[in-house]
Amino acid sequence: VKIPRLPFDKFISAKRTLTTQMKATGEVMSICNNFEGALMKAIRSLEQHVDCLRSYDFSALSVEELLERLKIVDDQRIYVIAEAIRKGISYEQIHDITKIDLWFIDKIAILTEMEHALETQPLTVDLLKEAKRIEFPDNVIARLTGKTEEEIKKMRYDNGIKAVYKMVDTCAAEFAASTPYYYCLLYTSPSPRD
């Protein structure tokens, strides 16, 4: 996943709306074995003090206000879409307003569903494994479950949920890469080769 780095945190007087004018000062790229996890990693990599789709709080907006806010194309749009999903606005309605493909809206919904599950269900090993599979960081899981980050880490370690590094196949398996690069993910099975 690639996300442009839009430095509105530094240029606070700049208009946040996105048009054809160049406003990005760079980009972040993240790699995971699923889109949701890559999106979560990319959001955290923006270095804008965000760690999940709740980092910008739009919960006070009514459904009508969210529908209007969805029309604004800016750097906070993904967070508005997440809040619209939380408030029950249909994927089709979000698509009609934003013209964003339903596939992407569904992936954002998977992340909001995990937030909801972490807030409302007891934290089981299976729920923790699923949250880690889609790259929810320990601090976010702790915040949503009301536990401490140390409790989450201990639960992870006790259940064999640990980091592994996978190589990116840059040569499409035609030949061995001379300068391979790797990405990290948390594995929940005994073997990282599953």
Give short role names for the model-derived ranges.
Residues 187-194:
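Conserved small/polar residues in nucleotide/adenosyl-binding loops
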Residues 1-3, 131-153:
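Phosphate/diphosphate-binding loops
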Residues 1-117, 121-127, 134-135, 163, ...:
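ATP-dependent carboxylate activation and anion-phosphoryl transfer catalytic cores
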Residues 142-145, 151-186:
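C-terminal amphipathic alpha-helical interaction region
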Residues 123-138, 174-186:
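Intrinsically disordered, low-complexity basic tails/linkers immediately adjacent to helix-turn-helix/homeobox/MYB/SANT
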